[in-house]
């Protein structure tokens, strides 16, 4: 429809200039700028172009198949399935089903995930606490040796922010904390400490993360996010929309969902 909203949000607000107008006249379309492909365009994967498109011409990668399809892990039970949920997802799933905040408790969300077939359900807030502790400890260490570090110190918990800084301000990369994001900390815990706790080989654990941001999909695929040497610490990332879509496809009676506790790592 040539509304150019994706171009405007990326250029004027995000300042990345990933999208641009291609061709002219009746053949005018939107494409990645400077003739590049999306992998070469320094995209931060913030998802704003997707959010602002009124006709869904842009969309994030759909990763439901390896989890929920007939040959997916929940149906074949080839591995122990573990899922972690970000705090922001609690509110978003409630809005999708028009549930009150009081009714859509974290425990009810945990109950929904167990109903779907996950063996273990974790709350990512545990790993968020670890991130705060790690970043806080690192900050104190830097304060003791100010002359050895570049300032200020930036958080590294958001992969979209990290990608943005690396592409737009490479001279400030050393300001980033060395701590992993909560998602990846939780993934490392699941494939290491928790695998040991339940006497399971990390290779036999299928780790799923439900997050509000599509940048998490790229983060989990980074080669550095393999703490066991057996594969990614987080195997699949689903965004809130994918999770809600699958819930709706199951025709789950959300008002009949039982409350259940999150597992303790």
Task: Name these PLM-found stretches.
Residues 37-59, 166-170, 179:
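Helix-enriched interaction subdomains in cytosolic or periplasmic regions
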Residues 1-12, 41-56, 128, 156-160, ...:
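Local cysteine-cluster metal-coordination motifs and their immediate loop/turn environment
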Residues 14, 53, 57, 194-198:
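Structural motif corresponding to the C-terminal cap of alpha-helices
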Residues 12-42, 56-81:
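Non-heme iron-sulfur electron-transfer modules
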Residues 2-4, 20, 52-62, 141-143:
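Short charge-dense sequence patches
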Residues 61-265:
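Iron-sulfur-associated redox domains of electron-transfer enzymes in respiratory
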Residues 23-25, 46-47, 232:
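Short, solvent-exposed loop/turn segments at the edges of secondary structure
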């Amino acid at each position: 429809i040539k509304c150019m909203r994706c171009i405007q949000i990326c250029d004027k607000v995000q300042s990345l200039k990933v999208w641009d107008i291609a061709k002219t006249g009746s053949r005018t379309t939107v494409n990645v700028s400077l003739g590049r492909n999306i992998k070469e365009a320094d995209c931060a994967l913030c998802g704003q172009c997707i959010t602002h498109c009124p006709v869904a011409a842009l969309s994030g990668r759909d990763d439901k198949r390896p989890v929920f399809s007939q040959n997916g892990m929940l149906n074949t039970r080839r591995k122990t399935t573990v899922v972690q949920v970000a705090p922001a997802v609690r509110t978003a799933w409630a809005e999708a089903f028009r549930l009150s905040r009081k009714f859509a408790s974290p425990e009810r969300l945990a109950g929904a995930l167990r109903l779907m077939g996950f063996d273990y359900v974790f709350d990512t807030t545990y790993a968020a606490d670890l991130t705060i502790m790690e970043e806080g400890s690192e900050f104190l260490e830097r304060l003791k040796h100010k002359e050895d570090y570049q300032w200020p110190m930036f958080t590294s918990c958001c992969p979209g922010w990290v990608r943005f800084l690396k592409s737009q301000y490479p001279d400030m990369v050393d300001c980033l904390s060395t701590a992993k994001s909560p998602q990846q900390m939780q993934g490392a815990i699941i494939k290491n400490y928790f695998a040991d706790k339940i006497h399971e080989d990390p290779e036999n654990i299928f780790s799923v993360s439900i997050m509000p941001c599509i940048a998490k999909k790229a983060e989990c695929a980074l080669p550095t996010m393999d703490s066991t040497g057996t594969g990614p610490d987080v195997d699949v990332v689903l965004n809130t929309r994918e999770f809600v879509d699958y819930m709706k496809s199951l025709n789950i009676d959300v008002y009949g969902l039982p409350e259940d506790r999150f597992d303790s790592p």
